[in-house]
Amino acid sequence: MPTVSMRDMLQAGVHFGHQTRYWNPKMGQYIFGARNKIHIINLEHTVPAFNDALAVIKQMASQKKKVLFVGTKRAAQKTVKEQAERAGMPYVSNRWLGGMLTNYKTIRGSIRSYRDLETQSQDGTFEKLTKKEALMRTRTMDKLELSIGGIKDMGGLPDAMFVIDVEHERIAIQEANKLGIPVIGVVDTNSDPAGVDYVIPGNDDAIRAIKLYVTAMADACLEGAREGSPAAAADEFVEVESEEKVANNG
């Protein structure tokens, strides 16, 4: 089971919150104190909260459920895209389009258009078009790639959503709440934890901290997927069978 230690978190700067004047009183229970007018997050809360969230994600992945990774702020974009792709999970790393979940039917239409253009670009259709028409279609495809490329294989609504910076992704969280999709979120000292089912109190700005969260989540997805695979189930069956033989022979 992938877990993250307090030492890992300290090295990544997870404990550094925002300036004290920007704090949200709802995060008071997670604050250890202040240093140089910066709130310090109590990692005694963060470590178990994060490891509990990893266990939930691992369990979901073992049941072939989809976890949507969301991080559209500049510091998170690259890591969210890379790690979600590594884990084989959907992601939104550029911009959250209003209605991405609550108006999924329309989004599905855009995904179909994107897939069609992708096919055309690969099967030689673009080469038969005028330069201008081919350029226009390429531009449309690139735009769609940016906005929905990460969810093209989601195949329906996700089973959970993992969010970096809940304040920045408030619309995404509201949509998930409306649909009863559980939200796991990294919540800094300036943010409102409302609407987040699994609160991970921590720094949501430092690239090292973001890498730590997102990489561990991707690892949990991969480990869960391995355990839920037919090969893993077969290994388990063989083990049980051999135990039964020993018992019968004894």
Curated annotation (Swiss-Prot):
Domain of life of the native organism: Bacteria
PROSITE patterns: RIBOSOMAL_S2_1, RIBOSOMAL_S2_2
Keywords: Ribonucleoprotein, Ribosomal protein
Listed Gene3D superfamilies: Glucose-6-phosphate isomerase like protein, domain 1 (3.40.50.10490), Helix hairpin bin (1.10.287.610)
S-S bridge residues: none
Biological process terms in GO annotation: translation
GO cellular component: cytosolic small ribosomal subunit
A GO term for molecular function: structural constituent of ribosome
Entries under PANTHER family matching the protein: 30S RIBOSOMAL PROTEIN S2 PROKARYOTIC AND ORGANELLAR, SMALL RIBOSOMAL SUBUNIT PROTEIN US2M
HAMAP family from the UniProt entry: Ribosomal_uS2_B
Family affiliation: Belongs to the universal ribosomal protein uS2 family.
Protein's name in the database: Small ribosomal subunit protein uS2
Organism (species): Teredinibacter turnerae (strain ATCC 39867 / T7901)
Lineage: Bacteria, Pseudomonadati, Pseudomonadota, Gammaproteobacteria, Cellvibrionales
Primary gene name: rpsB
